[in-house]
Amino acid sequence: MMKKPVILVPTDFTPVGDSAVAYATQLSKILDAKIELLHVVAKEKDAPMAKSALEAEIGRLEKRQIEASAHVEMGNIFDDIGKVADRQEARLIVMGTHGVKGMQHVMGSKALKVITNSDVPFIVVQKKPMKEAGFKTIIIPVDFNQEVKQSIKYAWEIGKYFDAKIHIVYVKEKDPFIAAKIEHNIPYAQELLEENGVAYSITGIDKKDFANEFIDLSAKLDADLITIINNHENIFTYFGGSFEQTIIGNKAEIPVLVINQIASKSAYSFSIYFG
């Protein structure tokens, strides 16, 4: 019997941590995956209470016919999530965040380091619950970077499970050289989606205040998932601040699938690991 793929869920037992568990629960049914709960403690004396809380959560999952296990890790959550993901051979990490303000306060600059240090894709969620129908509407910001093609491919692969419509949103760039590079990524998306019978749309947004306009459009479309590449060499970097951080902590509380550069350059594929 083949071993089920693992979804790793770091939890801190807060409402947003509970939201991550809820998302993972729904995804585990769709992807036929096992859930691995993780709680990291800095002091050994905190381990027994954490272990007890995790065992209670496992009991709730098992009542719902979800295969689950858990463990307590000594260390630092920012450094150890990637290590645990490797050890458990996790194929997806579902993690909660408290939004941009909370993320800056609680996690600071290390928030994206958690993702950057792992070759496993993350789905970062806030308190907003996952819809029963799942990720029916997926949105992707497109710039000139070649890794965006992998983001489009990931969106298509996960979207297959939900018969999703995919919305491509690109930057309207006045510089002809950059504009040509951005436009080069559009035909790839069209060909991939059309060949596989996926409904899609393509929309351009002015470069000025792209991040906030992108989030506003995502909310207007009632998006269920945003897909991005965690790449500091993209056009979005020049908009000021961290584009990735703004999207991850978006005010509409839309979940974000984040693929880092390590994964985007590897052979990782949802199709390979989740069928």
Regions found by a protein language model. Name each.
Residues 81-131, 219-273:
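Gly/Ser-rich helix-loop-strand patches that form or flank binding pockets
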Residues 17, 74, 104, 148, ...:
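A conditional alpha-helix N-cap/helix-loop micro-motif detector
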Residues 67-70, 202-203:
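Rossmann-fold cofactor-recognition segment
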Residues 55, 63:
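N-terminal beta1-alpha1-beta2 submodule of the flavodoxin-like/Rossmannoid cofactor-binding fold
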Residues 72-79, 205-211:
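Charged docking surfaces used in two-component/phosphorelay signaling
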